[in-house]
A protein has these predicted regions:
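N-terminal strand-loop-strand
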Residues: 1-34
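Nudix hydrolase/Nudix homology domain
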Residues: 25-30, 94-172
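Hydrophobic pocket-lining residues within nucleotide cofactor-binding pockets
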Residues: 38, 89, 134
């Protein structure tokens, strides 16, 4: 069993999803959400809180911030014992720039064994992908995650409705 979080945002009327790319040591390379396997008796939500912090090295915040994101979840996918929570966040075009520069610096200056064995360096970069880029992204995703992207594309109309409704509510 496993779980992950996929941040979503609206920009210029289109949905954008924040994906992370596995580092060069990953057994299954490619793009995916921010998640992983459950530890012990963790619930999917507990897994997301832990994994979201680890894989984004705190860029989305700590446990309270991840819990808040989860409480605003707009869509949930369950595929092959994996639960993915699609959660809205404000679009920040600079987030990938800062995260990616930070990761490049750390991953070139730290001992490679630390990078290889530490849970906080699983992602080498992050990037916003628009809803129209998902089909092109799918073959670049981790093998297990390609089915999840396929289902995500099928669910886009539903996600679009909910995210736009929630973003209009927040602006009032």
């Amino acid at each position: 069993m496993g779980a992950g979080i996929l941040p979503v945002s609206v920009r210029n009327g289109k949905l954008y999803f924040l994906f992370g790319k596995e580092n060069k040591y990953a057994d299954t390379p490619g793009w995916s959400d921010f998640g992983g396997g459950t530890d012990g008796n963790e619930t999917p939500q507990m897994t997301v809180i832990r994994e979201g912090q680890e894989e984004l090295t705190g860029f989305l915040g700590g446990p309270n911030e991840i819990k808040t994101m989860l409480s605003k979840c707009v869509h949930k996918l369950n595929i092959n014992n994996y639960t993915m929570f699609v959660c809205p966040m404000e679009y920040n075009e600079w987030l990938p720039f800062y995260y990616n520069n930070n990761q490049r610096f750390l991953q070139t200056h730290l001992d490679q064994d630390v990078i290889k064995n530490s849970k906080i360096f699983e992602k080498s970069e992050i990037k916003w992908f628009s809803e129209s880029e998902l089909r092109k992204l799918k073959p670049q995703c981790r093998s297990y995650f390609q089915n999840i992207v396929e289902q995500l594309m099928l669910d886009l109309p539903k996600i679009r409705r909910v995210v736009r409704t929630k973003s209009k509510t927040r602006k009032r």
